[in-house]
């Protein structure tokens, strides 16, 4: 299955394992809760989906790469204790608590949540000395004398032997005690994730043209040459910062992440072309409603160039959709905090300044706590930090304009909220107008051809673009989407009629 299907299967497994019956016991007994074993090529996102699953399920995640551990750190250190057997005092060997088990209890203490996932990566690459310990763990869910706490689902991962020489194959007895899931790379599925992860537009456009270069592992006389999903994502992150700093993005830089010289050279050449198209077609002008004269030449351009133009439009619009998503989340958090402020002011729990100071301290602590416990992703953290900054702005405003009475202080703060909302609504209007102009440009240049179909499909697949359209609406999107759906249905009816007539 692909990584998206694997993620859903893990969510289903977690929910099933953590379901309780009418007596409060787990519906599936702990001894029947098989550890999940994900097996697939390196760098396709096995670790990343575990973070997503934990956040979506609202549970803990404790992650370890097991190859980084020795037998002692996995099962604990030995110590001598005194026992009495049949009236005779004897010395016996016991073990301290495993570092891994201890970290689970630490995480429970930090988050206050007693259920979670224990994720162990590279499980089938352990050393010979640690192998018996891992087999015992998979079979009995124990490290040494200590058991994984009930409520923690065990998920493990590993690579097939063709990708890693250190792989140790499990025997049938072990495989019969795990829930094994094979994962394969799939660009179309990764692309959905890529939109949400804000992968660089040049990478998405390039891979749309050269899908076979998304994931590649080749062995030759010089060793292994490879490109992985992880490589593309890491490259994207650094590219954005390099662009901000004005650093060169060329073959010598790209090959550090895409460790296949041919693919690295090809992408570096495409990136140069991508920037050339950006200058030629003047995307900001198109989104403002003007159609540059040279834009009409693309009608007869190679299809690769058309895809690059669509990518540039989608990337530029995507930045506005991401901004909408972030500011909406921040404004909602800000609004919630103002509700608490209003309530406390009504109850006379202090002046506006005093209450805000307490709120800011409490909210800041909550952000730190949730971040440390791994309960929020990066976008949620950014939204909460933006709301925190808004609260600090309110505190500064009260210091200057505060009246000291409840009504006056709240009106002062509400004024700041209203100003932020007014700016946000203008940005929403601008983004909607830019999207409409993009549709008008494509309709004028390409009509309702395959370019329009691709543009609509990518908008519908994008997490932030779909959020924007579904929450804010856009007449042009609905118009062209409806037309294309009607054309598809008409073609389907024609095909069915031809089939019935035997033609």
Where are these regions (language model features)?
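Conformational switch/transducer regions in large eukaryotic molecular machines and scaffolds
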Residues: 35-37, 57-67, 80, 89-116, ...
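Residue-identity detector for glutamine
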Residues: 5-8, 15, 33, 52-55, ...
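Helix N-terminus capping/helix-initiation residues
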Residues: 2, 98, 171, 200, ...
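Intrinsically disordered, low-complexity segments enriched in small/polar residues
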Residues: 93, 268-269, 361, 367
């Amino acid at each position: 299955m692909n990584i998206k299907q694997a993620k859903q299967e893990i969510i289903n497994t977690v929910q099933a394992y953590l379901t309780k019956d009418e007596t409060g016991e787990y519906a599936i007994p702990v001894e029947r809760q098989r550890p999940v074993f994900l097996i697939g090529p390196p760098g396709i996102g096995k670790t990343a989906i575990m973070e997503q699953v934990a956040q979506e399920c609202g549970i803990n995640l404790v992650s370890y790469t097991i190859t980084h551990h020795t037998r002692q750190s996995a099962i604990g250190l030995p110590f001598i204790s005194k026992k009495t057997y049949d009236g005779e005092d004897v010395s016996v060997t016991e073990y301290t608590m495993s570092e891994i088990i201890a970290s689970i209890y630490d995480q429970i203490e930090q988050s206050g949540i007693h259920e979670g996932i224990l994720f162990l990566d590279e499980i089938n690459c352990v050393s010979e000395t640690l192998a018996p310990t891992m087999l015992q763990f998979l079979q009995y869910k124990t490290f040494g004398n200590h058991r994984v706490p009930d409520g923690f689902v065990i998920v493990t991962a590993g690579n097939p032997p063709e990708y890693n020489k250190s792989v140790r194959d499990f025997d049938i007895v072990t495989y019969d005690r795990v829930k094994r899931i094979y994962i394969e790379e799939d660009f179309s599925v990764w692309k959905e994730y890529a939109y949400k992860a804000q992968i660089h537009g040049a990478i998405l456009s390039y891979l749309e043209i050269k899908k076979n270069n998304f994931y590649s592992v080749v062995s030759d006389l010089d060793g292994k040459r490879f490109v992985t999903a992880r490589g593309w994502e890491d490259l994207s992150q650094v590219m954005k910062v390099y662009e901000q700093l004005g650093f060169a993005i060329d073959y010598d830089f790209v090959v550090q992440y895409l460790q296949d010289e041919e693919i690295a050279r090809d992408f570096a050449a495409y990136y140069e072309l991508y920037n050339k198209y950006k200058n030629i077609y003047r995307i900001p002008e198109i989104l403002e409603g003007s159609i540059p004269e040279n834009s009409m030449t693309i009608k007869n351009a190679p299809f690769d160039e058309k895809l690059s133009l669509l990518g540039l439009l989608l990337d530029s619009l995507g930045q506005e959709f991401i901004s909408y998503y972030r500011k909406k989340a921040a404004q909602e958090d800000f609004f919630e905090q103002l509700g608490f402020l209003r309530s406390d002011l009504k109850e006379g729990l202090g002046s506006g300044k005093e209450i805000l100071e307490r709120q800011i301290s409490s909210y800041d602590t909550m952000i730190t706590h949730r971040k440390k416990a791994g309960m929020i992703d990066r976008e949620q953290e950014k939204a909460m930090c933006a709301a925190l900054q808004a609260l600090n702005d309110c505190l500064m405003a009260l210091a200057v304009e505060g009246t000291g009475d409840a009504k006056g202080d709240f009106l002062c703060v509400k004024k700041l909220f209203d100003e932020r909302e007014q700016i946000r609504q203008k940005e929403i209007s601008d983004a909607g107008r830019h999207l409409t102009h993009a549709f008008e440009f494509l309709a004028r240049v390409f009509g309702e051809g395959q370019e329009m179909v691709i543009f609509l499909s990518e908008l519908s697949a994008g997490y932030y673009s779909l959020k924007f359209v579904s929450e804010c609406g856009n007449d042009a999107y609905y118009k062209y989407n409806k037309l294309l759906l009607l054309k598809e249905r008409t073609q389907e009816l024609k095909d069915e009629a031809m089939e019935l007539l035997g033609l």
